């Protein structure tokens, strides 16, 4: 998956490949009316999410969303974007979790397995198709994150360009300004890569489930279970992180760093870190907190590695166990 992110696309991941073209062609072509209705529904959804985000950020219109423009933008966007990210991850899982069951239902699976590289290409194509089908959601997530990255760059110009100096004052460990700039750039890189690798990981997990559990009923039950587990992890880490930031959770040292790193990697894919005010607070509250951006980037790359391994495992399992 890391090679794919670098632009080295294999043949089966390109839309002109016949297997991927067949996979993408399974979706029913929508009429003009259906497309317009879908666009209208999406527009209404965006408006509702924006209104909900503003109401949450302002405490039901009782206070401003933030003390600055960038803080306000982040506060309004946080909850809607978190919800969209969660739904995108679940969608990636469900799009691949029934891969083998679908092919068995179409009576194609035995033919694919008897053809050289047939099952392997089918599994790879289904995984690649996930990105094509979720491209609009992923594109929206990345676009909004780019807006937040732009907010960070804008904030760095505050105090005559000395804002980063002020944030790094008194943190542990003490680092030169150039190191702070480098680590902040790694955060922004990790925050843009994490959604892509998370979708790839969820899609690969669904693919692995599909070759192990082929009965549709059990597959659906596992998907529901995975959704609840994901929701519990996200909600638990979000609650713990909120309590920690408010000073209501008495942890320090390595425990606080692991909480912040786990939250950034598993709960919101580094979304909270894209508010430079919040991220600067973590530098002070958490030992080595300035390294959280590096941790997020490494976690995203590790997710990509795990996705590759799960896809390879799914291919081997399908070849050995039919």
PLM-predicted stretches and their roles:
Residues 1-108, 121-322:
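Hydrophobic alpha-helical transmembrane segments of membrane proteins
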Residues 113-120:
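Short helix-to-coil transition segments within interhelical loops
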